[in-house]
Curated annotation (Swiss-Prot):
Enzyme category, top tier: lyase
Keyword Lyase: yes
Reactions listed under catalytic activity: 5,6,7,8-tetrahydromethanopterin + formaldehyde = 5,10-methylenetetrahydromethanopterin + H2O; D-ribulose 5-phosphate + formaldehyde = D-arabino-hex-3-ulose 6-phosphate
Active site annotation, chain numbering: H17 (proton donor)
UniProt-recorded name of the protein: Bifunctional enzyme Fae/Hps
Pathway: Carbohydrate biosynthesis; D-ribose 5-phosphate biosynthesis
Phylogenetic classification of the source organism: Archaea, Methanobacteriati, Methanobacteriota, Stenosarchaea group, Methanomicrobia
Length: 392
């Protein structure tokens, strides 16, 4: 057996975070246990867990402090409430049948325990570490999380200490608000009026990017830190370089023109994926996007079927979305140009995943009100709107 578990519990300086391994004495966990007990490290001295002095639990459990212990006051928090809490959690896990009683002499546990140097309340240190250890053991032996849970939660989660959310496009449809006005003050004011929604994307349009460069992304981030921001460069050359520029500027997606050479599009997509951002292929003036897609080594993340501002007065269609999805089944389809409120049901009915709207929102007298109308037309609830966040 070689199982791994993790759990975080509590709040404030007494918050507990436990990483642990549980496995056979003769396996890698047993080897790690023996190494830890015999190869001491200054400030991270391993110690056996004990319910009280002279009463260790079974399976035998080794505690390793994560934070460097610098004085006896900090040591007392480990050699006391944390040591006892971990031991009691192991013993109770046996009593409750989580750890099989007939295997306690064959198994060992190695637990890495976090104690903040500023933690003061011994009662909370004990209770939080008890709960975190017990939960980590249960998760380890149940194989939690399984891969389906990981994939389900990975795009929802925000690391509490990181302090911001990295938004991904996994729950379409979305409204993409395109800011083509090169007046930065106007753009930032309008962005501040866009409702916070899981289904809104912010686009730094081509004129805005041309005037201020990709550094405008950081200005937008100051107004909307968690937004998914698309940089509409309409790249025609040096695809890998421009993708890297957008990634370095903390953008979430870069737009490449479908008129660019195939090698440029390929390099841009490869670099975008390497740096963790989305690659968007804009089909403006490309009359045969399917032919382009068939020549690519890797599909873009988003394919934008685009009618330009200069020709919006004419009748149009957004192309054969069904055929495109057959070639690029994992790609999201965006439609741009002439997307007005009455066209939303039509676009969604044709299979669009992203509706790109510019002046209909950004030039409105009441930006917030019009944006809310488009968001409501998506008929999509907020992600986890009614979820009480406890275990995740």
């Amino acid at each position: 057996m070689f199982q791994i578990g993790e759990a975080l519990m509590g709040q404030g300086s007494e918050l507990a975070h436990v990483d642990l391994m549980i496995g056979d004495k003769g396996g890698p966990v047993g080897q790690a246990f023996a190494n830890g007990l015999t190869q001491l490290s200054a400030g991270h001295t391993p110690l056996l867990s004990v319910i009280r002095p002279n009463l260790p639990p079974k399976p035998s459990t080794l505690i390793i402090p994560k934070v460097t212990v610098k004085n006896m006051d900090q040591a007392a928090k480990i050699f006391g409430p944390a040591q006892s809490a971990v031991a009691k959690a192991v013993a109770d896990s046996v009593e409750e049948g989580v750890i099989p009683k007939d295997q306690v002499e064959d198994l060992v546990v190695v637990a890495s325990v976090f104690i903040h140097p500023e933690a003061q309340d011994y009662n909370k240190i004990y209770r939080y570490n008890y709960g975190a250890t017990k939960l980590a053991i249960k998760r380890a032996l149940e194989g939690f999380p399984d891969i389906n849970k990981v994939l389900e939660e990975s795009n929802k989660s925000t690391h509490a200490i990181m302090g911001f959310k990295v938004t991904r496009l996994w729950d379409p449809p979305y409204l993409q608000v395109a800011f083509d006005n090169p007046n930065l003050e106007f753009v930032l004011s309008a962005i501040s009026q866009i409702p916070n929604s899981d289904h809104v994307i912010i686009e730094a349009g081509t004129p805005l990017i041309k005037r201020y460069g990709v550094d405008v992304i950081s200005k937008i981030r100051q107004v909307r830190p968690d937004a998914f921001i698309v940089a509409d460069l309409k790249t025609l050359d040096t695809g890998n370089l421009e993708a890297r520029m957008v990634a370095d500027a903390a953008g979430d997606a870069i737009v490449v023109s479908a008129l660019a050479p195939i090698s440029t599009i390929d390099k841009l997509i490869e670099e975008a994926h390497k740096t963790g951002i989305y690659a968007v292929m804009d089909t403006l003036n490309q009359h045969d996007p399917i032919s382009v897609l068939k020549q690519l080594k890797v599909m873009p993340d988003v394919i934008e079927l685009h009618r330009g501002i200069d020709i919006e007065g004419t009748e149009h269609a957004w192309g054969n979305i069904g055929e495109i999805k057959k070639i690029a089944p994992k790609a999201l389809i965006a439609v741009a140009g002439g997307v007005r409120l009455d066209k939303v049901p039509v676009a969604l009915g044709q299979g669009a995943d992203i509706l790109v709207v510019g002046r209909a929102i950004t030039n409105a007298k009441d930006v917030r009100e019009v944006a809310e109308q488009f968001i409501n037309a998506l008929n999509k609830p907020e992600i986890d709107q009614f979820r009480v966040m406890t275990d995740f």
